[in-house]
Amino acid sequence: EQFTFDGGNNKKKDMKMKNNLMVILIFSFISFHCGEDKNASDPYLVNGIPVKWLRTFSFSSDSSSDESWCVRQTSDGGFIIAGATDYTGLLIKTDSNGEEEWHQLFNNSTTLYSVRQVSDGGFIATGYFECDTLPGCYPDIYLLKTNSSGSIEWDQSFGTDDNNDWARDVIETQDGHFVITGTWDDDGWNSKAMLRKYSNTGSLIWGQTFTSSVANEGNSLMETPEGSLILVGYSGTQHGAYNHFMVKANSDGQQIWKKKNESVGDALLYAVCEDPDGGYVAAGFCNSWRTNFLLERNESGNIEWQNCFIEESSNYGYYDIIPSSGGGYYLIDDLCYLTKTDETGNIIFSVRLKHVNQSVIELDDGDIVVGGFGFREGNTGGPISILRLDPSKVE
């Protein structure tokens, strides 16, 4: 996150320090380049794996201020990418081969962290808006609805008056409205994980917050078949002692259960999906070395299994997880490793890609598309990238 506070406001300075720490944490102390196969002469061969195509998009002179946080498949077989360039919200629509069809820039001082195509063919996206009127100005949640061409139908920013608020994920619910999750009322020390529901015209329907410690955040969100909501993130303190956090709420946002677990070192969840048997599988990092972490909770919130890969080097966490059509799960982590596991999280294969570490998608033919790229060297941006490969080449 690129919050740029100045003007001598202490709370803003605290928030800047907090978000600098969050960038280091959530985007993984990134002082490396995602690995390339040094022995491959073919640029579409990565660690011996044929990559069917690789597309990159650049909107700044050296990509240093380009960000891409989320990639989703669209109903026409193409893809939608959410991010920012030069601190301006960005959506990119591609065809099924990853070629750009259009892009749209939005309000200055915005970043889009999540996007999904919705039932009318348009898109819902969310992130934050950082106003540039100082002093007395704090980051707010930004929510944006576009048509199928990316033109704005409505957008709005909202939050607490004197503290910081931002959204990490958004979904369309079964009734055609939208729910977001993220952080609410962050003063640099205390914060709340939140769920907020908005109508399909942008009106607030309800808002709920959840805490298990002084600092709490929601990172990812899903709706269950019966209409309940699952959010995952962390609960702990602003500057360490992170515990993985999962909340189940009903369709009105009322808490059904809330689970926070202590661990050796920090633990945090970035992504969640439904297990085919009805449980909830979440991914993130664990322990003081911030290695990759998976766990499953059943519908009552009890842990079915968990895997903290402490024998691995520090991969700094899985950022996305999806069920595999052949059983098990696909994941992408901070160091650009695409991993497949079985149904209980045991690794089947793991291969290092390049320039992609945020989102993973399985296509109808079994191919995998991976895209999005978090902060790189010196907490700057990087190439906005998306690639397609055949995972059977490494199974």
Predicted regions and their residues:
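Bacterial Sec-dependent N-terminal signal peptides
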Residues: 4, 15-48
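Intrinsically disordered, low-complexity serine/threonine-rich segments
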Residues: 6-8, 30-31, 71, 344
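Intrinsic-disorder-associated, low-complexity terminal segments enriched in Asp/Asn/His/Tyr and depleted
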Residues: 9-10, 14
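A sequence-level/structural motif corresponding to short, flexible coil/turn segments enriched
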Residues: 35-395
